[in-house]
């Protein structure tokens, strides 16, 4: 099956994938605020949310591989985050951060 990115991202599945990846990026950003040895309730809740998003992403990743034969990855830097191929030549979507 050929992937029409624009159409896919407007679908329920595509919208949910974007929502999941955006939330994962947010939770990972929140995790950076904690010390390496953090153990409090707020840390546990944040870690759990980030882990949940990662698990959901892995399901989306499998769907993309199974239906479209494309191996997408989550990519994030200080400048952007998004979903792309390993070599970052093909982006499903990319969000530039405001600096």
Q: Which residues fall in each region the model found?
A:
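Acidic, low-complexity, intrinsically disordered interaction modules
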Residues: 20-95
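Short, charge/polar-rich alpha-helical segments
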Residues: 2-28
